[in-house]
């Protein structure tokens, strides 16, 4: 999927939904919290706007949500591509997917470096290292090399500890043990997605979406520590900030799930009944339902019309794809 198209789509969609969801007449905020769900890029040093959703703290949380969500999707797609190409890391499709993943790692390190300059390079080195361990796990699973799988798991356990110490050395408000513990679901959920990819399971996209969903919590924890450390204005966990983060995650996921479902349909020759296509479409629709429930949590009467409209526009993209194919 073209990265520029994905970013533009997220930005436009996020702006439209946020305009409807965060600026109701007669009230600057809503006391009803949205449903947490699956996963807009902005500067971590974003200037405060006029509302609580535009505070520096809210912007930080949304930025980390987007970047960390993309990390999971890009990692999952790169690893699945490697599996589909028989583990050939020199295949052009694999090389392209890995480059896109590394570009996200660089962007994430630069976001960290924008507030902690000395941490940018160590963060990038550490982040790239843990991706390599996931590659080892994937290749071990694909080749049925139990020793390789075991070592990859051990390496990732050690990485969690080292990464926690790195973050704590920069942000004392975030205990090393807590950061390491927070990474457990990230590692396990990505293991689950990789296992599904290696097995050719139709629920691969659902597993990957679950892994991406965890990044909402990870971003919240990291943003909370950084905001406190830097004295950023706004409330990281306020209703407006949470709404922005959830919508960022869900709209991000929408584009990834739609792109992956359409790509799967093309790879399967347009057979919409193929199990892999059905699984990808089901994962995409689950995201649509989650997004409609977020809208419905603040505007109950809009939930069903929103879902119907959202599903309709996805159908148009399916028609376009089948027409092109």
Which residues does each predicted region cover?
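C-terminal motif of bacterial Sec signal peptides marking the signal peptidase cleavage site
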Residues: 18-21
């Amino acid at each position: 999927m073209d990265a520029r198209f994905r970013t533009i789509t997220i930005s436009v969609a996020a702006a439209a939904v946020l305009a409807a969801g965060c600026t109701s007449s007669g009230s600057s905020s809503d006391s009803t919290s949205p449903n947490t769900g699956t996963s807009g890029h902005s500067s971590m040093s974003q200037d405060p706007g006029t509302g609580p959703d535009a505070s520096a703290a809210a912007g930080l949380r949304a930025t980390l949500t987007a970047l960390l969500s993309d990390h999971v999707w890009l990692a999952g797609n790169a690893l699945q591509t490697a599996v589909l190409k028989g583990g050939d890391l020199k295949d052009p499709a694999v090389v392209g997917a890995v480059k896109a993943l590394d570009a996200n790692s660089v962007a994430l390190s630069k976001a960290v470096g924008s507030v902690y300059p000395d941490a940018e390079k160590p963060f990038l080195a550490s982040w790239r290292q843990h991706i390599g361990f996931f590659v080892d796990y994937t290749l071990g699973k694909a080749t049925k090399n139990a020793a390789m799988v075991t070592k990859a798991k051990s390496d990732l356990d050690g990485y969690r500890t080292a990464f926690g110490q790195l973050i704590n050395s920069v942000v004392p408000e975030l205990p090393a043990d807590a950061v390491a513990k927070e990474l457990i679901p990230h590692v396990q959920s990505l293991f689950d997605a990789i296992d599904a990819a290696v097995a050719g399971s139709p629920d691969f996209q659902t597993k990957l979406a679950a892994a991406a969903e965890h990044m909402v919590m990870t971003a919240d924890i990291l943003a909370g520590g950084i905001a406190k450390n830097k004295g950023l204005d706004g409330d990281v966990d306020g209703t407006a900030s949470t709404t922005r983060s959830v919508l960022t995650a869900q709209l991000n996921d929408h584009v990834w799930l739609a792109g992956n479902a359409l790509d799967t349909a093309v790879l399967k020759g347009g057979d919409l009944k193929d199990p892999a296509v059905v699984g990808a479409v089901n994962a995409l629709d689950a995201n649509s339902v989650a997004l409609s429930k977020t809208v419905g949590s603040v505007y109950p009467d809009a939930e069903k019309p929103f879902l119907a409209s959202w599903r309709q526009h996805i159908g148009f993209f399916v028609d376009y794809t089948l027409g092109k194919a």
